[in-house]
Curated annotation (Swiss-Prot):
Ranges annotated as biased composition (Basic and acidic residues): 149-160
Tissue expr: Expressed equally in both animal-vegetal and dorsal-ventral directions of the early blastula. Becomes enriched on the dorsal side of the embryo after cortical rotation. Expressed along the anterior margin of eye field of neurulae (stage 16 embryos) and in the anterolateral crescent that borders the eye field. Continues to be expressed in the optic cup at stage 26. Expressed in the central nervous system throughout the early tailbud stage including the entire hindbrain.
Entry similarity comment: Belongs to the DSH family.
Topology class, membrane: Peripheral membrane protein
Pro residues bias locations: 100-114
Residue ranges, compositional bias (Basic residues): 219-231
Name assigned to this protein: Segment polarity protein dishevelled homolog DVL-2
Modification(s) after translation: Phosphorylated. Phosphorylation is controlled by frizzled proteins, correlates with the onset of embryo dorsalizing events and is higher in the dorsal half of early cleavage embryos. Phosphorylated on tyrosine residues in response to association with efnb1/ephrin-B1.
Keywords from the named record: Cell membrane, Cell projection, Cilium, Cilium biogenesis/degradation, Cytoplasm, Cytoplasmic vesicle, Developmental protein, Gastrulation, Membrane, Nucleus, Phosphoprotein, Wnt signaling pathway
Organism: Xenopus laevis (African clawed frog)
Amino acid sequence: MAETKVIYHLDEEETPYLVKVPVPATDIRLRDFKAALGRGHAKYFFKAMDQDFGVVKEEISDDNAKLPCFNDRVVSWLASSEGSQPDSAPPAPATEVRPEPPPPVPPPIPPPPAERTSGIGDSRPPSFHPNVSGSTEQLDQDNESVISMRRDRVRRRESSEQAGVGRGVNGRTERHLSGYESSSTLLTSEIETSICDSEEDDTMSRFSSSTEQSSASRLLKRHRRRRKQRPPRLERTSSFSSVTDSTMSLNIITVTLNMEKYNFLGISIVGQSNERGDGGIYIGSIMKGGAVAADGRIEPGDMLLQVNDINFENMSNDDAVRVLRDIVHKPGPIVLTVAKCWDPSPQGYFTLPRNEPIHPIDPAAWVSHSAALSGSFPVYPGSASMSSMTSSTSVTETELSHALPPVSLFSLSVHTDLASVVKVMASPESGLEVRDRMWLKITIPNAFLGSDVVDWLYHHVEGFQDRREARKFASNLLKAGFIRHTVNKITFSEQCYYIFGDLTGCENYMTNLSLNDNDGSSGASDQDTLAPLPLPGASPWPLLPTFSYQYQAPHPYSTQPPAYHELSSYSYGMGSAGSQHSEGSRSSGSNRSDGGRGMQKDDRSGVAGVGGGDSKSGSGSESEYSTRSSIRRVGGGEAGPPSERSTSSRLPPHHPPSVHSYAAPGVPLSYNPMMLMMMPPPPLPPPGVCPPNSSVPPGAPPLVRDLASVPPELTATRQSFHMAMGNPSEFFVDVM
């Protein structure tokens, strides 16, 4: 006998069922299928062909209608309605379940305590429930009803009254208590509505509807079903946690990148994982020259939420990386949705901003470090009252030179020495991106890219015609040792990482600089020249109140400038402490060309004046440094040739070298600051005692520089030496 195979899908189960109907495929009807299936309360859909839409699911309810057949088979889908048999096994005709009758009205009982009337998931034992007299058959029917509700929540809500389950506002079984029905139901509805909504949380509804059972086996079944539902609940929790992490940021932005202008996206991504799964994709670093770097809105640490129309919220890290790689390889614009996150405790993926205050400022360490780098001494009390300075730099600017970075005091140019440029570039406020870099799995601390150096020089140093000249300047920095390659390459490349060299070497570099020496051979008599420092015994402020401040020993310097090796030939011993230099022996900016006024001051103060030809020194003659300074300042004539200025035999015979105490009255000094600046510090003698006389014959004096030839960027260095030597800015020590 011919038969027809009917394949039917029951509800949402993955595995279909097969039934053989003893009717030919050309004559099979719905009643034949129902007779073989034995299920009455269901909707039947069959695979059919429509002219407009193609293959569709057609619902057939007429028992005499023929069923559509494909390849001698019928494909059907069954949607169970309320009150049908559970779908855990193939149905049988004998197990058809009738609709449940409503539960009987229980007898009235006394009102329970108020604290038990409004709890969610009532925790009272089964003996407290009103339907304690219910039979096991009624419990089985309740079990079937709960399973049916699990299958189809929408139909369960629509037909809850038809199924015979009396449900409250939030899915709880109503207690039909005649004594306090209205008040108890109202209280339960209000409280449960504000706490749990059955439309949103199916787990709480099932838990509430199963509180009326008293069978141990029923409780065990409920416990097992609840364990089965835990994975979806944890999934919702994980999703909510992920959304919370992303929305906890300041804002979420959408960036559209035009990939036609750039060859690559230019980001590295970092995946975050924990025991609960993957925690999202974050921006690890941004590469120069990419589309993201050109846009500028995305920063390291931002969380990547979506690329184009693909959401990364519930996607694993591996899938997100694969999707992102596929999107980048496709042409067209890329839309990135990122959350601007900030992790207060980064795990090393990201770097803190350079201007972020991390540690409290220690003023003592700051001053000590600044003095070690710049070679300047700490400002001692009384410097603010030194208003007799007549140079172009005021006292306030001197103080600013210690408190502000050099970049705010002067502008850099191509004529600025390399040491000053590097010091400005190395300051934290310079704008150069200096951070830890990774190269071949090696961490390079405080490194910067060669292209960043060229860009910084091109934008901050004046005088470059094009970027190529800035690159040559950077190459000179590498050759001079101010920046170093990680493997000591001597050729500069913009694609390599560099670090700053030993910044203390800037002092060595500055001692060897030249500022267009003027030896006086040109015969120009009207040029302003810079005198060397005065010898000990000079007190440039005769009326300045004395103070008992003792210099602190600065950092020992191992650098000995070659231009000052002759200084050891002069003696700095005890002498007549009463002699003082006059104001005329100082080469100030306001009276350096006024020789007559300088002679009048020399006459009043009793200091040797050479212009008149006689000596008025009351406490011994001055040394040749002071004498040559007076010759240039007071005489007003042409400077002699270098041979005359470099030998002591040209001095008048009645000016033998004498020694003086460097300390001014009331100022005890335990060492000689000038000697300390020029050579490594010797052992400190007792207070008031200077090093003994040296037997080395005097050599050539330091070269005299033009004041106008000193670039403005050396102002801070000049002021530092003024404060160190205890002299105003009229004297400038040439350590170039």
